[in-house]
């Protein structure tokens, strides 16, 4: 159920946020390391609806342990190179047990079909290498 955290879709910013969530292929996921240092990483993602984003991860990715210990995260899209068009989302991440693998998640598989074919040996190879699903519930957008 949506909790209206995204900006009003009738505004320019609200439209931009939704457009980027729906169309962009990469966003930056920032977790916090054991020493308190922010750890940004580019990730493939799926906007699941109003307030959730899904990310698949390698099982040995440091962000897995970061999220277990400190589930608050930030996400952001690249800007326009001049400091504009910035979208920052904050929220809480959770690791999902018994969740469909990436190639079994039809919306994710469709979004990244071209990428998994070009950068991996197909969607099953990506799913094998990135089996850990993480859902981020967005709590704020700026």
Where are these regions (language model features)?
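Charged, gly/pro-rich active-site loop segments
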Residues: 1-12, 85-142
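Structural motif corresponding to alpha-helix initiation and N-cap regions
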Residues: 14-15, 60-61, 120
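Generic structural signal for secondary-structure transition and capping sites
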Residues: 25-26, 72, 117, 141
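Short, surface-exposed beta-strand-loop junctions and turns on beta-sheet-rich folds
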Residues: 61-63, 82
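Short secondary-structure boundary segments
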Residues: 78-80, 138
